[in-house]
């Protein structure tokens, strides 16, 4: 019985503790929302309508809560609650005359109506919809994170600095030297050296990251040795430690030692070249030069032949059979050749180690070794003493016919997928007979290498230094045009001592992704930023940066779209691909996606699959969840901490404490109310003269200035700075860092008041300029005014700065505004009007659906896009804002002038039309600054009648909605079918925009200058194809356009001056 009771208690206790309260809360909210939604959809169709409803609700509800105390008339109560709900801050009655209860209600209304609170609440709504309408989004996002982290750790743990091909080449090199050691260490017949079993080789290598990573290569197939003693297995363990060359390599790097590889599996692409072969040869050449004798007549160095495509054999060299599995091949080598004890080093140095390809090893019967030896040919690449004038290697270039147009077109046609929107796909039927002439004599077959790339590699190297590749890359970057124009058939380079160097050709083709899991590289076509890679001997290899620089607006609008152009039949076919990553607009700050995104302007993701959309939705969900925590801490912290600071300060200052007590104000309540009014931009104070009592106190003015900035205009700046600091201090590869990286890269997909880096810097610059302008005007016109008698000069400047901060947001007054210079008053009037524009324009220009919000929708065909469309829409936003504002201000001024006609006829200087306009603009800008009126402790609005007060209330409510985002804004939309439709439209618009910018940029560069185009002929094929498109379009549309014929008669290009 006791056992049953215990089990029942444990079962129910476990069920109680495992209750998902969030699930029940979401169900409850969903139940209520499903009942209200059909009616709310009609009344509140968009975010702006919902915002109006929320503000009006707070105004009316607040008036209901405040009025029962009956300390003032209802119109004044309504005026107070409207000012608190809109942060206008105008008052018709002294705030200190209200009861504490009424002050607390105003305090809460201001806290619940700030932009930070309202826009932050949208994050909770979006988070609810994420969890409610996407099944298991939390679990899926966590699984995606673990997958990305595991993949990243696996990639970091598998030596990312060495590709599979490079590692395979290095291993085979070690095999050759190991066999050499076996031959040298044997004192018996040559057959005894071949019968020894090879031991595992351990080689040291230095990894830049300092990771001690151990890698085990795959064991080769078991092959019997020549004596039949058993299989030979080669397993290598590479420890990343201090870089050093193998002992055998250091000991036997002589003039005639060499390694030769048979044909490896060929990728399905045109031949490319790995610079490692050439640089290894140069390195071994330098090692040899240190040990050579003074009277040596010639130098020979190692030439590593790379795999080639074709199976034909060279007609002018001795070829070794590719499928030779006869084990007696080694027997053809005389004993004198392999003998160590004979001392015949010349004969011994004529052996070449040939490693068979994996396919040949797999197809063999297992009785043959994986490597054989043969006599090295006498036609090895070497230095020869040739008469003639000494010339430099790099600077001397042999030229034939230099034609910039022909050379650039040839380079464009020979390179695959150059950075740009057009790429030429090379065919296997191209005839490169000119390159056959310079094929490597050590190659097993007679494949044709890309001679142009080999020449560039040779010209970009320096023989005299081992680690000079990085410097030569920089030099080649600046002189790339000259290098490309050199004759590809040039076979010799000259040294300073008069010796000529025959080029070392390499035919190594990197494996394709399908065969070996590696990446495809070509020297000139790869434009994706990749990490630096190291060769097997410790040298770094860097990828070239793209030579063409594009404007920021073009880079932001770019995405991956390649056009495969077939020149043979004259057809032009545009093909969109998702596998190429050449036109990325930006890189990811964190490892938050398992794929490389294609991003257009304003964080528009292009060409996403369903799986990618799910992964993107998961990281966006976690980013929103993290952002909620940051904003909650930010908002609560800056509402409480400054109040505590002011409380400590005022209790430590007896003068100000007694001032509060004499005015029947609690010092602690003053501290919290003032800090909250500053941070929430309310503008109301418990003291009757606003902040004039503190015009000679730096602490209050500086602290309140900081709160005023970070609570309004400076909020996006400080928020992004906080996220950036958190990102920099976050633990690598953590879920926390991924979410922060997504917020930094794509902030407007998550939050309306968080902007990208460039708009944030612009906002900071505008903030500094506007406040600096107000301070300068004040110092010029009012610094020495009689109003500031008795105030030190330093405090006068501080007062001017404090008033500049208050002018555009909170509306505090540290001086009598009516006594200032007229020009200063006008400048303050202008600043109050433009107070919301920096935030409003930043919100709208960073909108993901910016074009759609302005009515610029994507066309079905790219030809319908207007090429003269602007790259940004700041002018459109400003025009919309002016059309939204001006008529309402004019209408309000007209109504008040009618209602206050009698007072205006009295010609009272403190009740003039300018003073009324100043009050209207202050209410419409939700600032709360007023010229005041003599004898009263409130704003000028206290002298208005009921109609004028209602107009001011309407101005407050209308002006509070100036800075709202457009109706079509992704950050305020719920993840539903409407959002998917807008995403699809924005994607189409981004594609058409990219095509338009490509055409515009191309046409803007084609004006001829001298003997060729201004850009030196870059992107010539793109221009030619673009011209064909324009000519065909003009012919179809029946339009005639003037064209400019360049000096090359084969191309007709348009000249566009206004781009």
From Swiss-Prot:
Positions with biased composition (Basic residues): 540-552
UniProt keyword terms in alphabetical order = Cell membrane, Chloride, Chloride channel, Ion channel, Ion transport, Membrane, Potassium, Potassium transport, Transmembrane, Transmembrane helix, Transport
Q: What is its main location?
A: membrane
Q: Name one GO cellular component term.
A: chloride channel complex
Q: How is its activity regulated?
A: TRK1-mediated chloride conductance is blocked by 4,4'-diisothiocyanatostilbene-2,2'-disulfonic acid.
Bias type Low complexity, positions: 186-203, 412-423
Q: How does it sit in the membrane?
A: Multi-pass membrane protein
Induction entry: Induced during biofilm formation. Expression diminishes when pH was altered, either to acidic or to basic conditions.
Asked if the Swiss-Prot or TrEMBL record annotates the protein with the keyword Transmembrane, the reply is yes
Query: For bias kind Basic and acidic residues, which ranges apply?
Result: 236-245
- Residues exposed to the Extracellular side: 68-73, 91-99, 650-668, 686-696, 782-796, 814-820, 900-912, 932-945
Reactions listed under catalytic activity: K(+)(in) = K(+)(out); chloride(in) = chloride(out)
Which molecular-function annotations from GO does this UniProt entry contain? chloride channel activity; high-affinity potassium ion transmembrane transporter activity
The processes (GO biological process) annotated in the record are:
intracellular potassium ion homeostasis; potassium ion import across plasma membrane
Observed phenotype of the null mutant: Abolishes salivary gland-secreted histatin 5 (Hst 5) mediated killing.
- Which segments does the topology annotation call Cytoplasmic? 1-46, 123-625, 714-757, 845-877, 969-1059
UniProt feature, compositional bias: Acidic residues: 428-449, 469-490
Q: What are the boundaries of the region Disordered?
A: 180-276, 304-350, 404-574
Cell compartment(s), UniProt: Cell membrane
Q: Where is the composition biased (Polar residues)?
A: 335-344, 524-536, 556-566
Name the intramembrane ranges: 74-90, 669-685, 797-813, 913-931
Q: What does this protein do?
A: Potassium transporter that mediates K(+) influx, as well as Cl(-) efflux as a secondary function. TRK1 is the major K(+) uptake transporter that regulates membrane potential and intracellular pH. The TRK1-mediated Cl(-) efflux should serve as a Cl(-) detoxification route and may play a role in sustaining C.albicans on mammalian epithelial surfaces, or in physiological saline solutions such as saliva. Mediates candidacidal activities of cysteine-free peptides, but not of defensins. The hallmark of salivary gland-secreted histatin-5 (Hst 5) killing of C.albicans is the rapid efflux of cellular ATP and other small nucleotides and ions from the cell as well as concurrent intracellular uptake of propidium iodide (PI). TRK1 is the channel for Hst 5-induced killing and histatin-5 may directly or indirectly alter TRK1 function, allowing the efflux of larger anions, including ATP, and the influx of small cationic dyes, such as PI.
Name the family: Belongs to the TrkH potassium transport family.
The protein's name is: Potassium transporter TRK1
- State which gene encodes it: TRK1
